[in-house]
Amino acid sequence: MATLNVCGLKRRSQYPDFIEYFDKYDLICFVETKLEDTDVVSIPGFQCFSQPRKQKYIRKSGGIALYAKNDIFEHCKHLSTDSDYIMWISIDKSSTSMDENLIIGVTYVPPSQSRFFNDEELQTLENEITSMCSSHKYVYITGDLNARTANLIDYVQLDEFLAEEFELDDETVHFF
């Protein structure tokens, strides 16, 4: 399985190297696909589950997709969700070596300062994850949670010692 924040799947899929790279995987999860309900992005040998962002805006944003190889896709089922931040897929145990179905949650949580971030939506996501984990034996969460670090910063701070040691110019120092 591979997971990637693509920041626009349609645009990325135009590059043959991008598509060819994923041939070695059975499942590919993409977040920030920026797809709408009517968009179709084909990857040869795969079929797609897609969940566009429910909240629309002027330009496309968000969105989640899972591509499964054709022979696995028939064993996959899209599960309903109340959250815009996660897409749930169940993979039947008959196609794995597990004794129960595998539940995959593909997530994209917008940055906390984004206009699309919503505390209630985050709470819904947390509740759904808790519910899935309590009702299923195998739950796998993947995606982009945008560094939810509690009270810690979610960005890199400038190290003054390194700035002096490498004699960084003012423009670089002020970037951080």
Task: Set out the residue ranges of the language-model regions.
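A shared catalytic/ligand-binding motif for oxyanion handling
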Residues: 1-176
